[in-house]
Amino acid sequence: MPEIVDGYTHVLTERFFEDLTDKFGFQGLSGRPEFLWDHEQRKQDMVDYGVDKQIITLALPTMFQGMDHDLALDITRLANDEIRRLADEHPDEFIPVGTIPKVSGEFLAEFDRCVDELDMAGVQIFSNIDGRPLDDDQFWPLFERAEATDTPLWMHPQLWEWYDWASEYMEHRLFGWPFDTTLALSRLVFGGVMEEYPDLEIVSHHGGGMVPFYGRRIEMFYEQRMSYPENYQGYHEHAAELSQPAEEYFKKFNADTAVSGSTPAIDCAASFFNEGNVIFGTDYPFSPERGRQTIDYTIDAVDRMNADDETKADVFAGNLYDLID
């Protein structure tokens, strides 16, 4: 049995939840999501399915949407302290990743604290920040810091303003989150971020969204607009000048395997991004059976990949270690 490191899981601590609701008066969460801080059950689930370690990230990114700057900063500091504390209490099981939900001087300082003081393996950002795309000028200092410090960024999808009815069946998360992930990755490429910071490491959740499936469409779309600039004048006013074909920048991204146990989706991601950029991740504990199903199904899906045993072992653990070591 190869070593298995789950590269994208979500967690809260009870202390964080209590402070969030009592100290900070935040009322944006319904009920008490105790399954997110049942750490003993989490460790038992790991044992039962042979998972050796987990990357732990802050759950429920939607709490930050539209949140006041000062409140968000206080909550972010608390969250990162709690993630670090949890990893210190369970060093054999948990690898901590911080979270930066907004970008400003204070949040950039918090990024530095995550890297320099808290010794996080990486930092989680969101696919849009208060509705602003990731290639917005105000976010470039974060990418500059991340590249300079060799700090991988875990990118979690975030909600956005769209149709009011999209939330009725939760399509805004079912399909909206992979779509927003796709938008974010495309903005990083076409906005010139990946051109400026070629060594920037991004871990995209849920298999890289639509990017692997539409890889050839991405390239053809870009080539069409480059070949006939007179027909797409608005495009050229916004798109960055790229020194390589657009597809080459997309292939630099990493993608996790949190696609609900779909081997074809994982094979598609491995074919597009290349197998060295695919990282085992389950989205635990968000599945039936409080996360056990997603562990079970995702391990099985990787086992059934169209790849040799060495490649599968890299997906299960080696690729992540290459990223964070």
Question: Can you annotate each of these PLM segments?
Answer:
Residues 2-7, 11-53, 81-88, 109-113, ...:
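Mid-to-C-terminal alpha-helical segments outside catalytic/metal-binding sites
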Residues 10-11, 102, 157-161, 285-287:
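Short glycine-enriched loops at secondary-structure junctions
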Residues 15-20, 67, 110, 165-168, ...:
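Short aromatic-enriched loop/helix-cap "lid" or pocket-rim segments at secondary-structure transitions
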Residues 27-67, 93-99, 121-125:
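Divalent metal-dependent hydrolysis catalytic cores, especially in the metallo-beta-lactamase
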Residues 32-40, 77, 81, 132-143:
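Aromatic- and glycine-enriched glycan-recognition loops and surfaces
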Residues 57-60, 99-101, 156-158, 205-208, ...:
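Short, well-ordered beta-to-alpha junction loops that form the rim of enzyme active sites
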Residues 59-73, 105-106, 167-171:
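Surface-exposed, active-site-proximal loop segments in enzymatic domains
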Residues 87, 117-277:
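Catalytic pocket-lining loop regions of alpha/beta-barrel enzymes
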